[in-house]
């Protein structure tokens, strides 16, 4: 049986569409960006999608800003050298907060970032308590506090930074079950509040992958808000108004930075998302 798993020197085996389509790169340090890609694909199903994830340097939340900027620019450059891009989505909150200026300076195509959905959450809350669930890096960054001051200064913001949730989301996509008891332990600071958040911002693209489990643990009626739909709408607008005419007839493809057993285990998941082939990107 022919395998769809390939290294960088093997030609793509997947059937290719006949009509040229705009090429969109979705990038994350791990698989969390698939939640953003899924929203974009629902709105724009007929694009040529490339998903790239940095399984060598994952997770980014513990890396320095200088490292993240240099690494993201290097990876996007490597993809651009293989496929002329119409647009890139940096589907990682940590990378978005630090790398967008460098990317926009280097590349002519639009680059879309991800920011915590604090503004819509502040509008939705009924009790005035908004939870921000993110990585520790996102919780600490000045940009996050600027968003809160600008859009949610009348709300009580309960921030919870967790790297463990990122690992749980990755493990779920690898086929592991998610421990609700572990989730309760992570969310205990909120669950013990006299008035817990009624609206929770999923401030990491991994966290929508845990939506069902989070709703089982958080108080009944809690709203979960993320940026996926807004990013999809922004992508559609930019492709129509500002993106270069970079089109491809190739099939959707996923890139990892190292062909590890863990990356190989993701192939069935990537195929469910429409990526028939996984290759190692030479960087």
UniProtKB/Swiss-Prot annotation:
Pfam families documented for this protein = Asp_Glu_race
Q: Which UniProt keywords apply?
A: Cell shape, Cell wall biogenesis/degradation, Isomerase, Peptidoglycan synthesis
What positions does UniProt annotate as the active site of this protein? 92 (proton donor/acceptor), 204 (proton donor/acceptor)
UniProt KW Cell wall biogenesis/degradation keyword: yes
Enzyme Commission (EC) number: 5.1.1.3
- From the Swiss-Prot or TrEMBL record, what is one GO molecular function term? glutamate racemase activity
Q: Which reaction does it catalyse?
A: L-glutamate = D-glutamate
Question: What pathway annotation does it carry?
Answer: Cell wall biogenesis; peptidoglycan biosynthesis
| A GO BP annotation | cell wall organization
Question: What InterPro entries has UniProt attached to this entry?
Answer: Asp/Glu/hydantoin_racemase (IPR015942), Asp/Glu_race (IPR001920), Asp/Glu_racemase_AS_1 (IPR018187), Asp/Glu_racemase_AS_2 (IPR033134), Glu_race (IPR004391)
What does this gene product do? Provides the (R)-glutamate required for cell wall biosynthesis.
PANTHER family in alphabetical order: GLUTAMATE RACEMASE
Q: Family assignment?
A: Belongs to the aspartate/glutamate racemases family.
Q: What is this protein called?
A: Glutamate racemase
User: Which source organism?
Assistant: Salmonella typhimurium (strain LT2 / SGSC1412 / ATCC 700720)
């Amino acid at each position: 049986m022919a395998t769809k798993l390939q290294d960088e020197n093997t030609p793509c085996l997947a059937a290719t569409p006949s009509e040229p389509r705009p090429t969109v790169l979705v990038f994350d340090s791990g698989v969390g960006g698939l939640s953003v890609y899924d929203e974009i694909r629902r709105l724009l199903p007929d694009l040529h999608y490339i998903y790239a994830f940095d399984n060598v340097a994952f997770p980014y939340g513990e890396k320095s800003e200088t490292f993240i900027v240099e690494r993201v620019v290097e990876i996007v450059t490597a993809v651009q050298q293989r496929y002329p891009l119409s647009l890139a989505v940096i589907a990682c909150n940590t990378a978005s907060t630090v790398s967008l200026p460098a990317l926009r300076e280097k590349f002519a195509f639009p680059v879309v970032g991800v920011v915590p959905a604090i503004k819509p959450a502040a509008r939705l809350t009924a009790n005035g308590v908004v939870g921000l669930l993110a990585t520790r890096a996102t919780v600490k960054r000045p940009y996050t506090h600027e968003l809160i001051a600008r859009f949610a200064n009348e709300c009580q913001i309960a921030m919870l930074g967790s790297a463990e949730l990122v690992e749980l989301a990755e493990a779920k996509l690898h086929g592991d079950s998610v421990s609700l008891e572990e989730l309760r332990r992570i969310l205990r600071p909120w669950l013990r509040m006299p008035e817990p958040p009624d609206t929770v911002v999923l401030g990491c693209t991994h966290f929508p992958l845990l939506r069902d489990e989070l709703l089982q643990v958080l108080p009944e009626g809690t709203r979960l808000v993320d940026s996926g739909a807004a990013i999809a709408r922004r992508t559609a607008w930019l492709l129509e108004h500002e993106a270069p005419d970079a089109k491809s007839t190739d099939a959707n493809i996923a890139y990892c930075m190292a062909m590890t057993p863990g990356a190989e285990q993701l192939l069935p998941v990537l195929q469910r998302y429409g990526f028939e082939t996984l290759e190692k990107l030479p960087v």
